[in-house]
A protein has these predicted regions:
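Intrinsically disordered, low-complexity acidic Ser/Thr-rich regulatory segments
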Residues: 1-37, 49
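Short strand-coil-strand connectors
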Residues: 13, 37, 51, 69, ...
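General beta-strand recognition
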Residues: 25, 35, 49, 54-56, ...
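Amphipathic hydrophobic-ligand
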Residues: 41-43
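C-terminal boundary/linker segments immediately following FHA domains
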Residues: 56, 67-97
Length: 97
């Protein structure tokens, strides 16, 4: 599975991010894999990881929350078509061909 940015928030990562690469950190700090320069995003906001061929999103105690399909989540399985929202950025989970 991959992530695709759905809006024009200027972020420092490729438009397509492969979720099979292990854990991916998301946040405002420069040491994140997906750096989001948005004041509504915590320094270390969330992470996405794969375990036994399933991918998960996990909030890391962020102030403003991590949303999956419009609902605030702490930890949840990801499926193709899901939409993750972190700050003002929306990312769509897609299935690789």
């Amino acid at each position: 599975m991959s992530l695709n940015a759905m809006n024009s928030c200027e972020i420092e990562f490729e438009r397509n991010v492969n979720l099979q690469a292990g854990a991916i950190s998301i946040g405002r700090a420069s040491d994140n894999d997906l750096r989001i320069p948005d004041q509504t995003v915590s320094a270390h906001h969330a992470r996405i990881f794969t375990y036994l061929e399933a991918s998960f999103i996990e909030d890391l105690g962020s102030t403003n929350g991590t949303y999956l399909n419009g609902k605030r989540v702490q930890k949840h399985t990801l499926h193709p078509g899901d939409v993750i929202q972190v700050g003002r950025l929306e990312l769509k989970v897609t299935k690789d061909n």
